[in-house]
Amino acid sequence: MSKDILFKTEDFVFSYRVGGVLIQNNKILLQKPKNDDFAFIGGHVSCMETTAETLKREFEEELHAKIAVDNLLAVGEVFFPWGKKPCHQISLYYKVHLLNDNDIPSEGSFHGYDYLENERIDLDFCWIPLEELKNGLKVYPEELIPYILSDKNETVHFVSRQI
C-alpha cells in the first residue's frame, strides 16, 4: 500500500493534496463530509505518485468514475486547524472531465466514502449550480471560487489562512 504525503509532528501537520474541479451543465461536483463544508473532490498524493495519478485514483475510489485530468487551475498554500494542531497544506487543483458521463448521476446528490488514516469518512457528492457559488455557498478553500467563476485559462496561486 502506498503512503500518503501527510506528516504529523507534536506541533503541526503537513499535507500534500490534489483536488479536481468537475463542471458539467453549469454545475460543479463537490464532496461534503458529514458535519463539514463542501470541498473539491481529491485527496492526499501518495509517495512516488503524480498529482494526475492521484486524481484518477481518488475519483475511481470515491466515485467509481474514470476521469481525464485537464489543465492546472491553481496552486494553494492552505493553513487550517487539523484537530488541535495547525496544518500547512500544499494543494494543486486541476480541471477534470469524466471519460464516461454515465459513470455517475448527472444531477442531484449521491453517497460515497473515503478513508483517511484507516478511518472511513462518509461523503455526499452534490452537483451544485455555479450560481450558488456566486451567492456565497461555503466551499473549502473559498479562495479558489473566484478563479473557477472567472473561467480564465491561466494557473493562479492563492493563500488560504483559516488559522
Task: Write out the residue ranges for each language-model feature.
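Acidic, metal-coordinating catalytic segment for phosphate/diphosphate chemistry
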Residues: M1-G19
